[in-house]
Structure formats: C-alpha cells, structure tokens
C-alpha cells in the first residue's frame, strides 16, 4: 500500500459539536392497527391487538401482536405476545481512514420482555427456549380450550417446522432467520425474558472461518479484513453483501411469550426492548501489512416501549406515562450522586426534554477527574467531567435539546 502524507486515525465514537440548537433525541413514530376477532369452537374467542413503533435514530422497529384468548373454561386470563414485524438494523458502519480504519458491526441482538406491574401477570411459557443453532428458527404455539398451552420450536435445520402435535382450538407459527448466529434464552423467569441472538463465525472464502476471538501472529484478527497487504483502510473491509445478513443488514426477531393473569385483573404492564450490541473491529497498517483487532461490546443501543395490556377491552396500548416515571427515577438517583460539591448540577424533564440547572455556576461538581455520559437509547450524546464548571455543563446540555424518554446519565 502506498504511503500518504498524513495518518488518519479511526474514531470509534463520534463526538458531538456543541453549537446552535442541535437536537439529540429518540425520534420515534407509532402506528395502530385495528384489532381482529377470531371465533373458536365451543364458545371461545381470540382478540388480536397490534402496536408498531419506530425509532429513527437507532433504526429499530418494535412491533408486537397480542392475542387475548377469551376462554370460558379457563381459570386464568391468557395473552399470547409475538414480536412479528420487528426489525433491528445492523448499523454496519465504516469509520474512514487510510492507515487506520474501523468497522462497527452487530455482534449480538437482544429481545427483552418484562412484566413491570406488581400484579398476578406472569410469563407462563416462551419460545424459543434453550440454545438454537439452526439457520431458521420456527416457533409454534397452540391453545386448547380449558387453558392448555403448548409451544414448540424446531431444531432440525432451516426447513424444519416447529414440532407441536395435537388438536388445538387456535394455533400460530412464527419464524426468523439467523445464519451464522445462534439464539439463547438467557433470562427465563416469571417476570423477565431475554433472548440473545449472538454471532458465531464468518466463513470468508479468501481466508477461512473467523470469529470474535480469532488471532494470527502476523495479522491479528482477520475477521472482516479484505486484504492482508493491499487497499487503503476505508476500502479494506469485507462488504456488507458478503458478510452474514444479520451482520450486514439487520435482524427481524420473532419470539413468543405466553402471559397469564388472574381473572380479576383489569390491566397489566409490559415492557419490550429490542437491543443491538456492536463490536468495533479496527485495522492498522503495521510493517507493510494490515493488523486487525476486535473490541467487544463497544456499543449498546436499543429501543424500548412500555405497554398497557387491557384485559377487559382486549387491547394493547402504549404507556408513555410509565416510561416517563421510570425516567425520573433514574434522574433523581443521578441528582443525589452529583450533589456533593460546591458547584450544584441537577437534571429534570420538561415533557420529554432533558433540562439541566446549576447553582454556583463557576465551580465544578468536585475536584475529581470523573467523567459522566448522557445516553439516548444507549447511544452516548454528551460527556462531562466533574471538574468542569457546572454553568458550562448546563448551558451545553440545554443547547443540545436532548429528548427521551429513554435518557440515561451514568459514570463512564
């Protein structure tokens, strides 16, 4: 590779330019679909309710279908939740450079479900379960009047069907593709579920099979390295059309959760998060050859929605008030931690916008060299140091017009 006059270094995390009134926010939209009703034999009914939201900044779509089963023979209320229609973009992003360059790529996707109300609602069953390594994962749920729920998941390759048998009053099947990734249900309790779909390996025809930990004495990790000794940095990554589809383009999770509740319940609270964990793969020109390193779990970006399950009216609705309440709990905890020096800095929410106020503006929070980050849906948008004057910090934050509802402030 020919030498250049200057050496361009890759930057893993972009900094924020603080000028004007730049807005940093979770730009989202939502859509309602009219519900449908299915009549079951012997008197039962299934009420289907849909909700779709989209976060533009993270390019994540949360879509859920809730099937409320009205069964006169069951002693519980039952809802089947699927994430059919959801999508998490890969954000396969190259950081330009000549002698140094970086690639942000998704090493794992998560779909998380949590019942946040302190009522009788609980996760009765879920699918898929255990570890799924097939290229296509198909889950099936069947319901028999009287409250019997059966779920099944394929484990026999990309063309296999989910394996539940029997006579059912109602049945549904969902699936997703995960070539070169595998599914693990990491959390499976009565109130929380967490599916992880993690990267396994990539078979690049030029060099062979590589994973996140691959190492070569001469070239380091060649995971997404196109050439060992040619190309400028920016052009020396494997294209998104060559890597696995989940790596280059994104993932469409489609999982199943069965929720039961006492007959006396009127509403329950549900939270769904779709998350993207990304590594930073860097290459550096060293001694006439490329050297690759893979930094794990560098980015944690997500999109969360709070929902209200209306058992009486068989509807799922967005619960924005719940999201703001959770937001304020976190902000109040941060305010308590920052209230320790002469310079006072505190945060509040004005609607969905983060506001900062200060007193003794010419002083810092402390004399300690401690950094804090402000994150929106997991993406860092601002950093401040405890030694910086609180007046400058609050002015910067208010100019940025940071909007939630999922804002996190934490030490970094």
Range-by-range predicted roles:
Residues 20-41:
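Sec-dependent signal peptide cleavage junction
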Residues 180-233:
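Amphipathic, membrane-active segments
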Residues 281-333, 410:
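Short beta-strand elements
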Residues 378-389:
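Solvent-exposed serine/threonine-rich low-complexity stretches and specific carbohydrate-binding patches
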């Amino acid at each position: 590779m020919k030498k250049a006059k200057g050496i361009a270094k890759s930057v893993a995390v972009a900094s924020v330019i603080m000028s004007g009134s730049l807005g940093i926010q979770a730009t989202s939209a939502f859509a309602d679909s009219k519900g449908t009703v299915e009549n079951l034999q012997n008197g039962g009914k299934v009420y289907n309710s849909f909700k779709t939201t989209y976060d533009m900044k993270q390019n994540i779509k949360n879509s859920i279908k809730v099937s409320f089963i009205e069964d006169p023979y069951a002693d519980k209320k039952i809802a089947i939740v699927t994430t059919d229609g959801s999508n998490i973009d890969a954000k396969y992003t190259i950081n330009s450079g000549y002698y140094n360059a970086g690639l942000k790529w998704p090493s794992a996707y998560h779909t998380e479900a949590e019942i946040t109300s302190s009522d009788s609602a609980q996760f009765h069953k879920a699918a898929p379960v255990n570890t799924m390594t097939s290229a296509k994962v198909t889950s099936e749920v069947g319901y028999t009047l009287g409250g019997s729920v059966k779920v099944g998941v394929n484990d026999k390759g990309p063309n296999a069907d989910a394996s539940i048998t029997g006579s059912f009053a109602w049945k549904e099947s969902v699936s997703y593709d995960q070539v070169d990734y595998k599914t693990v249900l990491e959390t499976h309790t009565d109130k929380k579920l967490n599916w992880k779909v993690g990267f396994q390996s990539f078979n690049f025809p030029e060099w062979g099979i590589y994973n996140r930990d691959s190492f070569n004495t001469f070239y380091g990790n060649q995971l997404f390295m196109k050439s060992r000794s040619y190309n400028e940095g920016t052009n020396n990554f494997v294209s998104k059309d060559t890597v696995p589809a989940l790596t280059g383009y994104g993932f469409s999770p489609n999982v199943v959760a069965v929720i039961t509740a006492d007959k006396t319940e009127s509403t329950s609270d549900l939270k769904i998060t779709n998350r993207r964990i990304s590594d930073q793969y860097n290459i550096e020109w060293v001694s006439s050859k490329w050297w690759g390193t893979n930094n794990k779990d560098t980015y944690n970006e997500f999109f969360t929605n709070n929902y209200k399950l209306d058992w009486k009216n068989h509807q799922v609705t967005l619960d924005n008030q719940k999201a703001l309440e959770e937001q304020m709990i976190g902000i109040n905890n941060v305010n308590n931690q920052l209230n320790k020096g002469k310079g006072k800095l505190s945060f509040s929410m004005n609607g969905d916008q983060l506001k900062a106020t200060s007193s003794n503006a010419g002083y810092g929070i402390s004399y300690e060299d401690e950094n804090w980050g402000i994150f929106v849906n997991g993406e860092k948008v601002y950093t401040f140091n405890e030694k910086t004057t609180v007046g400058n910090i609050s002015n910067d934050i208010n100019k940025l017009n940071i909007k939630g509802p999922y804002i996190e402030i934490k030490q970094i």
